[in-house]
């Protein structure tokens, strides 16, 4: 399931984050990928343990924790601390797939990468090119969202970032381990939850809504790994 999560950050939050990270030290993005990814990756990033990146990353995770659409879709259990990248002057990242398991920097924990997240920190009119292209069984999907919006998609997807030919594309990216590893099951739970919320707004907590809510939680109880 690929999902647009709007307004993760307010316009004011984006401005403050950009002020903070634009003046930070950026390094070659190849430092964070394996040999295969390094062949097709041309960008810059904040270092993984950058104090600036860690501080801003916590602000992003706090915002996500209060975003009901994200929580419903991702059913998050564990997060990779958000990273930050910058593309300009023709920089790009060719087709690749994210690693299935990553070590969480600064800890002894690992994370199964169920979901990939890209949070846009540049407005679309600030740069040319730079679309995130995600390939699945239905074809290729190009994504270029307003600053503060995020795209959520299965980490198993092959994807790339098109060359940025003008301006700068700045974003945050990270991975989520979900309570429900299977994308199909997670998608069913998301659709059920969204429909329950819509019906509840119209009908209130009637007997049928309570029954459907019970079915949702029974399925989650059966499928969740916590």
UniProtKB/Swiss-Prot annotation:
The top EC class, named as a word, is oxidoreductase
Fetch the Gene3D superfamilies from UniProt.
q2cbj1_9rhob like domain, Rabenosyn, Rab binding domain
Q: Which residues form the Fe2OG dioxygenase domain?
A: 78-178
Enzyme Commission numbers on file? 1.14.11.-
Q: Which domain of life is it from?
A: Bacteria
Q: Which residues bind 2-oxoglutarate?
A: 169
Looking up SMART domains in the UniProt record yields:
P4Hc
Write down the species. Janthinobacterium sp. (strain Marseille)
Residues binding Fe cation, per UniProt? 96, 98, 159
Gene Ontology molecular function: any one: iron ion binding
Q: Could you tell me the Gene Ontology terms of the biological process aspect for this record?
A: DNA damage response; intracellular iron ion homeostasis
The alphabetized UniProt keywords are: Dioxygenase, Iron, Metal-binding, Oxidoreductase, Vitamin C
Q: What is this protein called?
A: PKHD-type hydroxylase mma_3618
Q: Give the organism's phylogenetic lineage.
A: Bacteria, Pseudomonadati, Pseudomonadota, Betaproteobacteria, Burkholderiales
Q: Which Pfam families match?
A: 2OG-FeII_Oxy_3, PKHD_C
